[in-house]
Amino acid sequence: MTLLITGDSIVSAEAVWDHATMANRELAFKAGDVIKVLDASNKDWWWGQIDDEEGWFPASFVRLWVNQEDEVEEGPSDVQNGHLDPNSDCLCLGRPLQNRDQMRANVINEIMSTERHYIKHLKDICEGYLKQCRKRRDMFSDEQLKVIFGNIEDIYRFQMGFVRDLEKQYNNDDPHLSEIGPCFLEHQDGFWIYSEYCNNHLDACMELSKLMKDSRYQHFFEACRLLQQMIDIAIDGFLLTPVQKICKYPLQLAELLKYTAQDHSDYRYVAAALAVMRNVTQQINERKRRLENIDKIAQWQASVLDWEGEDILDRSSELIYTGEMAWIYQPYGRNQQRVFFLFDHQMVLCKKDLIRRDILYYKGRIDMDKYEVVDIEDGRDDDFNVSMKNAFKLHNKETEEIHLFFAKKLEEKIRWLRAFREERKMVQEDEKIGFEISENQKRQAAMTVRKVPKQKGVNSARSVPPSYPPPQDPLNHGQYLVPDGIAQSQVFEFTEPKRSQSPFWQNFSRYCEGIKKPNRSKRVSDYDDAGVDFCSGNILHSGCFFYHWGFPCCSTAGSLQFCI
């Protein structure tokens, strides 16, 4: 290492841990940053550079790159001619390796070394922290420990078996001949347990943050670290290790494939392992994103009026597709226009408000686990006795119930059919890895919705909970439905598009002017300007109380009264 630096070679290291510091002469960095090592004469503290910043940093916080690019002359202190000692936790660099086999040996040895080092970290977490926490029932409940540590013990057991198989495939005499690709393929299903841990990690950090406000917990965790003789890193740093580890596998396998000849017996296995691990990390990231978006689903549900039944988050975590279609539920039934929201496991049916088209009313849901999608050719359907175009069915095999849907265009029908296939695929993948939203995450989403301040103005109804009462006639109730700060003309322009008035309604309006205003309380004048023609969208004259089909009606913003 020293020979590389003194020989004007560039020695690069990758940060494994975050190093936050306020000291002037220390170098701050985050995990994943690349550091140029300038001085390694001290075994514990090295001098390095990131961009234009230089400073001291802990040597244990970084991992040297396997293959340094610059060449140096061989010296007496070279260790294993540039090989990484698999029995140590650090990389021993000597004379640079000049052929593919030697380069591959470097990568193999690094993988073995980091796996052994990682196993030690998992053991320290399970025995140094979790085991001690379970002894203190006065400080930790079972639920708290589940949130903080997640399924770390399952990961520890899995990694022990994985490393045992790696050891069997490792060729200690000629590391480049090792065939470790099959190990990743044999254990590919086991890596999915990281999904649960990664999804829970944010909750773990939040719970730890609350506990650390109490000095008792600070002292307890520090005592656990010292008792287990762990390096000087806080517990949240140790708990971050599995998240970092699962993201490192594709990088390591890509490096291994780079230095593996195509005629090597391990080449096709490494290539397949790389594809598998990339898929695992991609899916884990996708599920992490889904959990981060559950607050939006909870907020959407709160905006839907007249909600009934269980919450969306009780079964679903992703909105897959949404659109408006015509729908018939039973033979000879009436064609109804509905807005459909397809989630995993269920599809929610809503109806738009007649005036406020941005307001939705809950009208039911369909359990997608019980239905199959049936594509239908254009023509006439004998069961429903209707002509069909751009249609498809949802058929319940158990009850023989059928829902018939009509898309406006063929392209829209194709998108719906594709969305249904995606929904089934997502459900199957979630069942495979055991993905679900924890009760704690559901509570957090519900709390977030309650904390969102209700908006004022045109969109105020979108914040009203499902128990929103039916609209009331402002002439019979002493309250406004239109906020004082908004011009009513603006409100109605928003809710009803402008259109030319027919001669019938012009004559009708003149007829209304001749009708004597009913005798009401003195405060009626306060609400006279709230009247609106529900067909034309025009605001009526002050004091105009018009009649429709012989029955008095009054329409206001967001509250349309059909007195029929």
UniProtKB/Swiss-Prot annotation:
Keywords: Cytoplasm, Guanine-nucleotide releasing factor, Phosphoprotein, SH3 domain, Synapse. InterPro entries: ARHGEF9_SH3, DBL_dom_sf, DH_dom, PH-like_dom_sf, PH_domain, SH3-like_dom_sf, SH3_domain, SOS1_NGEF_PH. Residues 451-470 are annotated as: Disordered. GO terms for cellular component: cytosol; postsynaptic density. The lineage of its organism: Eukaryota, Metazoa, Chordata, Craniata, Vertebrata. Acts as a guanine nucleotide exchange factor (GEF) for CDC42. Promotes formation of GPHN clusters. It comes from the Eukaryota. Residues 103-287 form the DH domain. Interacts with GPHN. This is Rho guanine nucleotide exchange factor 9. It comes from Pongo abelii. Residues 318-425 form the PH domain.
